Amino acid sequence: MKYELKKTNGNARRGRLTFSRPKGEYHVETPAFMPVGTYGTVKGMTPEEVAQTGAQILLGNTFHLWLRPGQEIMRQHGDLHDFMQWHGPILTDSGGFQVFSLGKLRKIKEEGVYFQNPISGEKVFLSPEKSMEIQYDLGSDIVMIFDECTPYPATFDYAKQSMEMSLRWAKRSRDRFDELQNPNALFGIIQGGVYEELRKVSVEKLVEIGFDGYAVGGLAVGEPKEDMHRILEYVCPQIPADKPRYLMGVGKPEDLVEGVRRGIDMFDCVMPTRNARNGHLFVTNGIVKIRNAKYRNDISPLDPECDCYTCKNYTKAYLYHLDKCGEILGARLNTIHNLRYYQRLMAEIRQAIDEDRFDDFVVEFYQRIGKEVPPLQLAKEGENA
C-alpha cells in the first residue's frame, strides 16, 4: 500500500491510497468511508451493488469470520476477496473490539484473551499472533493490530494499564506480521481513553514501532462528542503527516465531517446499513424515518438530490409500503440509498478540499441539516504537515 497526501485545506487532508492486487492497481481516494461487511457481505447487497454506491474499500470482521466460516474454508477459496467476490481492497479489524464487547464472557491476560465462543459455547483463545495469522489467511489489504479497546468510562489508571498492554500487543502484532512476510499494510491503533497524556504516549510508542497507518481507537464508545473532538484535535497533529489516519467505528454524517475537519482520512461504521434496515434514512436535509405514517401517501422521491437507484425509481410511499409489509426489497433499497448518501458526502468533502473551500462546505452542510457548526479549537497543522 502507498499513501500520497495530495492537498490540505486547513486541517482537512486530500489523499490517495494505492493497492496492488492480483486484478491490478486499486486507488482509494481519501477522505474515504468504508462500508462494513461483518460476515463477508454488506448486508443484503451484492459486491457490484456496493461498488455502484461509490465504495472503494470494504471492512471485514476478523473475529466473526474466524468463528464462521473459519480459516480453512477461507484458504480453500483463496482468501476473503475470492470468498465474497469483492476484488477491491479490504481492511479487517483485528477482533479486539468484538472480544471486549463480550463482557463477562471473556478474560483478558497478558498472553491474549480467553473467551466463550458466542455461537458454540466452547472456550477459545485469541492473541496478537493469532489475529495476524487469521488476517493473513483473509488476505486483508490493511491489517489492524490486536489491541484492547478501552471502555468508557475508565479511570486514568485502568486506561493507562490498558493502553500499555495494547502497546505490548502492538509490538507482538508487528513481529508476527513480519514473520509471516505479509506483503500488505499494517496499521497501529492509538488508545488511551479520554486522557491526552495517555494518547500522547500511545502515538509516540506506536510511531517508534513503525506502521503503515495509524487508527484512533477507543472513541465512539459512549463518551461525549466534546471528548471525541478534543482527543482528535490533540492526537491528529502527532500522527506522521505522510501516513493515513483512520477513525474506527465512526459514525454519523456529521461525525465524518468533524473527523475530516480534524485531519482524519478514513472512516467505517455500520450506521448507514443498520439504520437503513430500521427505516432510518439519511437525506440532504437531515433524516427521513420512513416508518412514519406521514409517508403513506407521499409520492415524492426519498431525496431529489440523490442519484441512487432507489431515489431515481421509487417514491417514499413505496418505501413505506415495503417496510410495513416487511419486504426484503425495502431493506435493500434503503441500504442502497444510505450507502450512496455516505459516498456522495465523502465525494463532496473531497471536492471541497480540492477547491480550497472546505470551511464553506462545513457551513453549508450544517445549514442543510439544521444544526450549529461545532467549535474547532485546533490550530492549523504546521509542525509536521
Swiss-Prot record:
UniProt lineage: Bacteria, Pseudomonadati, Pseudomonadota, Gammaproteobacteria, Pasteurellales
Co-factor requirement: Zn(2+)
Spans annotated as RNA binding: 249-255, 273-277
Major enzyme class: transferase
Role according to the record: Catalyzes the base-exchange of a guanine (G) residue with the queuine precursor 7-aminomethyl-7-deazaguanine (PreQ1) at position 34 (anticodon wobble position) in tRNAs with GU(N) anticodons (tRNA-Asp, -Asn, -His and -Tyr). Catalysis occurs through a double-displacement mechanism. The nucleophile active site attacks the C1' of nucleotide 34 to detach the guanine base from the RNA, forming a covalent enzyme-RNA intermediate. The proton acceptor active site deprotonates the incoming PreQ1, allowing a nucleophilic attack on the C1' of the ribose to form the product.
Residues annotated as catalytic: 93 (proton acceptor), 268 (nucleophile)
Name the record gives this protein: Queuine tRNA-ribosyltransferase
Cofactor remark: Binds 1 zinc ion per subunit.
Gene name of the record: tgt
Top-level division of the source organism's lineage: Bacteria
